[in-house]
Amino acid sequence: MNSSFSAPAKKSLGQHFLADRYYIDRIVQAVDPRAGQHLVEIGPGQGAITFPLLRKHGALTVIEFDRDLIAPLTEAAAPIGALRIIHRDVLSVDFTALADGTPIRLVGNLPYNISSPILFHALDHAAAVADMHFMLQKEVVDRMAAGPGSKVYGRLSVMLQAYCEVTALFVVPPGAFRPPPKVDSAVVRLVPRDPATVLINDRRRFADVVRAGFGQRRKTLRNALSAICEPAHFDAAQVRPDARAEQLEVADFIRLANVELA
């Protein structure tokens, strides 16, 4: 039984509503909600994922920015389970406060136009997040999961993999959506690492090193990082200054950012 409803997609909000039952079921199976868990869906839209999750779990919190979807979501959810709706921009939601001591499981078909900001916002609250299952443009998922040497390995890859285990799960074709996007989508799982194993001394310094390294990716690290790293930084971190950012492992960036010169 599908309780999702029809509503026009708003291009300004980057909305593409999932409509294919096969892929809806695959996402719900990947999430595999269990009793006692705190599920939070970002951008429920027409409820394609919302209502199957609610039916399976009994309770769900959703964050929806589009006010026109609030009433139909509330009405359709009433006979199914306890749906809590937060009508706000997801980037303004404090996930740590929302978790309230119980790590949240984030789920969502993320709007293409703000997917990266949402990912970095979730990272800021990683200690309060158990895991994340997101659908995004396939090219973004490819970048998230890429390794050194790949043409799509970059800032997003390093920043996410430093704090999370990233696993690309499956591709979702344009025809599964209404309206269909122009590109393939993919579902990705992110599991935040134990904070005790994330050996980053200064998060801002780490982010600065990664950003600068990939900001001019054709340059050697010596040149790309000249404003923030001295030759001694490379020596102490055992990182070759004549290498390029795309050749470094995540651990190399962490060591380089952690170096403190006397």
From Swiss-Prot:
Gene3D superfamilies, per database record: Ribosomal RNA adenine dimethylase-like, domain 2, Vaccinia Virus protein VP39
Keyword Cell membrane appears in the UniProt entry: no
Cell compartments where the protein resides: Cytoplasm
Stored SMART domains: rADc
Residues the entry annotates as binding S-adenosyl-L-methionine: H16, L18, G43, E64, D89, N109
Catalysis: reaction(s): adenosine(1518)/adenosine(1519) in 16S rRNA + 4 S-adenosyl-L-methionine = N(6)-dimethyladenosine(1518)/N(6)-dimethyladenosine(1519) in 16S rRNA + 4 S-adenosyl-L-homocysteine + 4 H(+)
InterPro entries on file: KsgA/Erm, rRNA_Ade_diMease-like_C, rRNA_Ade_Mease_Trfase_CS, rRNA_Ade_methylase_Trfase_N, rRNA_adenine_dimethylase, SAM-dependent_MTases_sf
MF terms in GO: 16S rRNA (adenine(1518)-N(6)/adenine(1519)-N(6))-dimethyltransferase activity; RNA binding
GO cellular component, one term: cytosol
UniProtKB keywords: Cytoplasm, Methyltransferase, RNA-binding, rRNA processing, S-adenosyl-L-methionine, Transferase
EC number: 2.1.1.182
Main subcellular location of this protein, as a coarse class: cytoplasm
Entry superkingdom: Bacteria
Record-linked HAMAP family: 16SrRNA_methyltr_A (MF_00607)
Stated family: Belongs to the class I-like SAM-binding methyltransferase superfamily. rRNA adenine N(6)-methyltransferase family. RsmA subfamily.
Role played: Specifically dimethylates two adjacent adenosines (A1518 and A1519) in the loop of a conserved hairpin near the 3'-end of 16S rRNA in the 30S particle. May play a critical role in biogenesis of 30S subunits.
Protein name: Ribosomal RNA small subunit methyltransferase A
Species name: Xanthomonas axonopodis pv. citri (strain 306)
